[in-house]
């Protein structure tokens, strides 16, 4: 059973890759996640994966809003986990953060012989600090505590990069053998370059593309300021910009874009299909990642970087540690948070087609030969093998129902039979 709260499945690419890979290797997989406009079904089976979704009736704003969302989603997840236990059964819960609160479910199900895996997507304390500029308060330290409890509860931990591995070893005091670096490599079967579509440039010679979530910490406001400088101060009026993705900050960013007088050449698409995404990325001349420096961003692997590289696109980004590891020579790096220098780096690439081609080819080969999911997924299977070897369970590839599940199922069937007899 995989639990994810941030995004619905299959929109959450990491979780979907994990689920399908496990299924392809013989595991029975269920997922609990939120609904969305794109994925409104409460239950469906996709590619053999049982997906259970719940509705979140409000959009989180501010700390209290996020807290309410986390509590509501946690309760819905707990409810659905019981349904999965009864209907499908499971031996392992894999909880993806944020939030770092599902260790409580892990502890509960450990009472019935289930194991708990922590899939560490985000450094929650550092993300909170990036959102609310608070590193000293009670809430920051509470998040540190929740992270430690989650790491302690987990039998094994999946992390996205070496920086997160260090956190698991140092802050969580995990054994090295229990921490697996599972990089979210792109799926080359899903992401494939297509013929460029000049119409997407909206009558201008160049297209610059941003892909990703639009939350307060994602730096899209930095990008808009860089675009303003590039267009009005460097007189680059020959460039269209497209911003692809959704998130809680979208409407505020659209208003900012309108107020800056850039609505004619900066366009927000919202979330798009894989086919439309391939058209945009195949057409773009330059792709950008404006994540500003924070401890969270500096230590996090940004999936957009790898997806740009699949399409052989040169990248402009702020000089952050894990972005540098992923892109290497496929990107030009601006001093962190310097929007003018960021704009200048875009200008350099627009003026140098040979540089763009060389950087793009390097990045594409790095993904194809090293960073694609086909190369990065083995630690996922190794982590599950470690869990099942410890359990010495014969159900490693087809989870059996626990005694509790069977008892509950018998009670359920008894109630149904009683009601049927009453009719």
Model-derived segments and spans:
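Nucleotide-activated donor-binding/catalytic signature segment of Leloir-type glycosyltransferases, i.e.
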Residues: 244, 251-278
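Carbohydrate-associated surface elements
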Residues: 163, 184-185
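Membrane-proximal helix-turn-helix segments that form the acceptor-binding/catalytic region
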Residues: 78-82, 101-112, 124, 138-157
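Conserved acidic donor-binding segment of nucleotide-sugar-dependent glycosyltransferases
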Residues: 331-339, 348-354
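N-terminal subdomain of nucleotide-sugar transferases
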Residues: 1-52, 156, 402-423
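Acidic donor-binding loop of glycosyltransferase active sites
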Residues: 155, 265, 281-299, 313
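Acidic anion/phosphate-binding donor-loop and adjacent secondary structure
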Residues: 169-173, 185-200, 219, 389-390
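Conserved donor-binding/catalytic core segment of Leloir-type glycosyltransferases
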Residues: 1, 200-228, 242
